[in-house]
Structures are given as C-alpha cells and as structure tokens.
C-alpha cells in the first residue's frame, strides 16, 4: 500500500494548529525580514529534489512528478517563481539545506528521526513502507537471515537508519553498505538488471519501477507505513514554515492534495508480471509498425496515451473482434465508425484516426468544471462505458456528497452502476461500471510503462552514442583499414 492512512482532515487540522502555535515566531511581526520576505524579494522559491518518476522528472523539457507539482503549487501560492535544484544523492540535499543553498527539500523523503537535529519536517502528504527487493528468478529471502549476497542502499537515506537499527536490535550478523555514487532509483535498477543482489526502496517507487523493470521483485516489507514529508532548515524563523502549513491546509480543504495523490499513486496498486512483460515485449516488437500512425493522428492527445488505449482495446491487433461486434485497433462499434467516417474498421490508420477523433470529441463534450488534467480519465470512462453512463456516475457521486468533478471520487462510484441498489435510479440504467474502472486504471498503468520504457531506451541509446563518440576520438581512423597506433 502507498496510500496515506492519515485522514486529510487530520492533516489539515494539525497544520492549522501548528500554524497558530508558530504565530509568535514569525519575524515580520517584530519588524524583522524573515525567510518568506527574502523569498518574495528574490522572486524565487528554491526547491532541492532528486530525479525519479514519482518525485521529479522531465520529458522533452516538460517537468512532472508529485513533489514537483506540489512545490509548483506552493510557489504559485507564494506568488514567486519555482526554481528546481536537482541533486544526485540525499546527503547533498541536506548539505544544500545546511548551507542555505535551498529553501526546502521536496524529494519523496521518508520521515527520518536522525535528521531532526538538522532539519524539521512538514506534514505528511502520502505514506510508504520500506521494502527489500531482489531480482525475480533468484531465491526469494523471507527475512534478513536468508540473505545470500550484497545489500547496498543510497547514502543518507532512511534505509540506512533502518538497517542500522535492525543490526543493533535484531540481526547482528546483517552486513550492508551505502553508495554515494548511486541514487536509490539506480540501485533498484541494478537489482532488476542482476548487477546487485539486494537493496531497499520505498513501496511507491518500487511499484512504479516494476512497470518498466518487471524483474524487480519485493521480498518482504521491512517497515510499516511511514510518512513522506518535506524538510526545512531548523530555524527560529517560522515565516516560510507557517506559510507552508497554511498552504497545506488549503490543499487539503479543497481536495487538491487528494487529487495529486490519485494522479501519481492511485493506479500503482496491483502488479501483474506476465502482463507487464508481455506489454514491454509488444513495445519492442509490435508498436514500431503503428507508432507513426499514433503520432500522425494524436492531435492534442499525447501519442503515447493514444497508443496505450489501443493496446488496452486490442493488444495492437488490427484484426481484433469482440463478441459484441466491435473491431480493429481501437475497437470501434459499427455505429461509432459510421459517425466518424471510418469505412474499414480493421484498417489500422482508419481505426486510429477514428478513435483519436472520438476521444477528442468526448474531451470537448465534458463539463468545463472538470479540471484539465483529469478530463482524459472521464473521457476514457465514457469511451468504454458510454457518455450517458459516465454522467450517471457523476450524479451518483454528487448525491453521495462527493465531488463530481474529481476523478478520485467518481471512479469509486463506477462499480455502483452495476449494483441493483443504485442503477434503477440512474438515467441510463445498468452498466458494467467495474469494467470501466479497470479499463482506465489499466491504461494509466500501461502509460507509466510505455513512457518509462521509452525514456530508458533513449537514455541507453544516448549513453551508447557517447561511448562510441569517445572511442572515435581516442582511436581516429587515418586511412583505409588503418588507425593511429597501428
């Protein structure tokens, strides 16, 4: 589990009480210039982080990540520009905080009691458990007593603290080491590639990386769930800290924090090794035949999202046919195809073009009150279920005091469309809402796999090209079949 167990009401209440308690220590009340004043005068909020799919990443210069989005919203709340400062390891993060080179750390950091003499933590925004991982196919250890190999964790991480405690209290024979050169993500990748026996990771990051490296397997949970939090410098100046607590309270109250958690963690729960392995194989062997068509017809939709929709529909089989008569890569009904001008549903280009147009029409048809970054999930539910049934799910949500514009609220009501207790009172009647729920969740998981897998391939290709270029410089060819040194 990666979902936080503390209620958002509790987080908001604690944040409010802390803000009130800190009120006397805010420097501007005594005529002094505090940290918040300095940030506003500078016009920048400096946030140190670590690159990771969950925390902060960039694809084609477009930043994303749970911590990035949360930090961006905090900077907007303060009315300043966000400046992201990436670091390679956790020790560097805290050094930057000590040296006043950053204003806060937003890097998916687990609460670590050993850090409290140097820094203080903000409210938790989700929770994770620490897990020991190994490569699938090698013997699975059931406890630290079963380890037969090397355990390496990232230097400065909470995993170091955990292993120290376990060695002192329960496993005196436990041997492990820390790496300054490798990040936690890189160590997890090394385990998946068979280059390292074991490491520790947090459950959320592991769940995401398994979509790209399905050989990465969880041996056992090392800890119960622990809060993930931002870190601030220990100081008598509480101005920035108090502003952060006010910001968190607003995020909790308006549901923004819950929606961010849903966006990045709501779909990572279940993992199917065979399904993931099959999909990654299809990326290499089948997708190249159709990628240019997805790119050509995607329009305002990310072509990779359009591609994973097609995979969910047909596994990229242009001849696919269901018992209900839907056909082709995008599995269009005859009526839908006719309305889109698709004459041959099993023609790959016609099917992709038709599916893209249909999805964009659904996006435009949605109520304007639905947030921009959540509209696609509502549109996909309508694509699978029918637009009217999706509206029924929104009405059910509103009737139960949920937010009909929030995907995290509406998706939980989709299965109710097939329950006798609810569907007789809906406008459009019975629908297989549980299938629509799984449909959207599967697409989100496939999207994580496709985006991450392609990024890994690009990174490896760039590394290979750099090595080739370096070899070319050190051994230049000066004649046919000759090189310097021959």
Curated annotation (Swiss-Prot):
Query: By its UniProt entry, which Pfam families does this protein fall under?
Result: SBP_bac_3, SLT
Tell me which Gene Ontology terms the entry assigns under biological process: cell wall macromolecule catabolic process; cell wall organization; peptidoglycan catabolic process
**Signal peptide coordinates:** 1-21
* Cited InterPro entries: Lysozyme-like_dom_sf (IPR023346), MltF (IPR023703), Solute-binding_3/MltF_N (IPR001638), Transglyc_AS (IPR000189), Transglycosylase_SLT_dom_1 (IPR008258)
Which family is annotated?
A: In the N-terminal section; belongs to the bacterial solute-binding protein 3 family. In the C-terminal section; belongs to the transglycosylase Slt family.
Q: Which GO terms describe its cellular component?
A: cell outer membrane
The domain-related comment in the record is:
The N-terminal domain does not have lytic activity and probably modulates enzymatic activity. The C-terminal domain is the catalytic active domain.
Would the keyword Cell cycle turn up in this protein's UniProt record? no
Broad EC category? lyase
Write the gene name. mltF
Membrane topology classification: Peripheral membrane protein
The protein's UniProt keywords, in alphabetical order, are: Cell outer membrane, Cell wall biogenesis/degradation, Lyase, Membrane, Signal
Q: Which organism is it from?
A: Yersinia pestis
User: What PROSITE patterns does the database record attribute to this sequence?
Assistant: TRANSGLYCOSYLASE
Q: Describe the function of this protein.
A: Murein-degrading enzyme that degrades murein glycan strands and insoluble, high-molecular weight murein sacculi, with the concomitant formation of a 1,6-anhydromuramoyl product. Lytic transglycosylases (LTs) play an integral role in the metabolism of the peptidoglycan (PG) sacculus. Their lytic action creates space within the PG sacculus to allow for its expansion as well as for the insertion of various structures such as secretion systems and flagella.
Where is this protein primarily located?
Answer: membrane
Protein name, UniProt field: Membrane-bound lytic murein transglycosylase F
Record-annotated active site: 313
Region ranges (LT domain): 269-486
Q: Name one GO molecular function term.
A: peptidoglycan lytic transglycosylase activity
- Catalyzes what? Exolytic cleavage of the (1->4)-beta-glycosidic linkage between N-acetylmuramic acid (MurNAc) and N-acetylglucosamine (GlcNAc) residues in peptidoglycan, from either the reducing or the non-reducing ends of the peptidoglycan chains, with concomitant formation of a 1,6-anhydrobond in the MurNAc residue
Keyword Membrane listed? The answer is: yes
Q: Where is this region: Non-LT domain?
A: 22-268
